[in-house]
Amino acid sequence: YAYEETIAVASLVLGGVMQRHPRLDVCVSHGGGAIAFLKQRFESMATFLGTESTFAEDLKLLWFDSHLEEGPAHDLVVSTVGQDRMVFGTNFGGWDTPTVITDFDQSLTTNAIKLLRLPWNE
């Protein structure tokens, strides 16, 4: 699945879909596969293709779920796309939920509300 997620993100961004449809909300599972790890290569590809915006800018138009192991992988995705583009994700609630949920406070509320365009009264 990580390959498919990586290809999907690259296709959406390099294909200009996010630029043509700026209000389109796409949430990619598992932190986008290997996209954070390969971002620099895709950035070079975007430059070679002559895209109007950078790969990094368009990457931040997507949403990513946090269904990753805690640690370096999660940290890399957050540093690549920003905490404000992360939402909580899990396959089976409970057994794979992070032990420390405080890192996901913003993802569990504010970001999910934005992504789902829900009304919110604080």
Per-region residue spans from a language model:
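Histidine/acidic residue-rich metal-binding segments in metalloenzymes
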Residues: 1-57, 72-84
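Mid-to-C-terminal alpha-helical segments outside catalytic/metal-binding sites
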Residues: 24, 34, 64, 71-87, ...
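Short, flexible loop segments at the rims of nucleotide/cofactor-binding pockets, characterized by
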Residues: 3-5, 63-67
